[in-house]
Amino acid sequence: MATVKTKQRRKSMAGKGTMNVLEFMENQIRLMRDANRLGTAYNYEKTKKNLTEFLEGVDIPFTKVDEQFISEYNAFLIRRGMVRNSVSFYMRILRAVYNKAVRQKLVKPSNPFLDVYTGVDKTRKRAVTESVISQLYKLDLSHEKHLALARDIFIFSYCTRGMAFVDIAYLKKDNIRSGVITYARRKTGQQLAIRVEPAIKKIIERYYCETSAYVFPILTTSEPRQAYEEYRLAINNYNRLLRRLSNMLPAECKLTSYTSRHSWATAARNHNI
């Protein structure tokens, strides 16, 4: 909870007759949506919501975003129980917003972020063994279609060199020609080609739907904003189902949407692929 002193400071910072921080962020979000940069728009939206809570709804001009303000916001995030990487995420977004404001001459160049962490701590990459992959594949999920889909997506990712969930969600039938999957990673734009091996083909055929352009029943529309919202809901649901699958395996493990990618990389390294 904000102190009386902090509340008084925020009220005194409220901007008049200039572009304020939250207003500027809303404009940036609108521009990103118009450019179909929906992932970045989503991150800005999360940060704006968080910052609005910190400011208790009182918008401020960029001239008031100084080292003291950033320090108080940093402390606010920590008090909410966020880990260092999460705090850094919000700081990096706000720094990007601030730098855009500098380029648009809304504020004089400065660096109020000097005393806060804006890096990314390395997290432990959790891979599972080929034995666990085999156990997962053999699970009888005939009466649990949602779990079966989550399992099949995980196996598909593993068999396609760790294809990311976002790329699986957006994968279309048109991406498959002459027994080869070709697609561009949505994160990097990197073009990849993967041969459709029997295990991959079996999963693709299991979810074939004549009326859908997509390979898997994850997205239902090609409209960018609606498709992105469906993807956001789907990845959360996918990770929830993977937690349930983890509890069904004999070996103690934790499956996430990243595990299949790390597991493939580990297996490839072990086999000198």
Please identify what each model-predicted range represents.
Residues 133, 197-252:
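Active-site/catalytic core of tyrosine-dependent DNA strand-transfer enzymes
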Residues 99-107, 157-178:
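Short, charged phosphate-coordinating catalytic segments
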Residues 116-165:
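Basic, Lys/Arg- and aromatic-enriched nucleic-acid-binding interface segment
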Residues 115, 170-206:
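Conserved tyrosine-mediated DNA breakage-rejoining catalytic core shared by Y-recombinases
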Residues 26-39, 49-124, 139-142:
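N-terminal core-binding DNA-recognition domain of tyrosine recombinases/integrases
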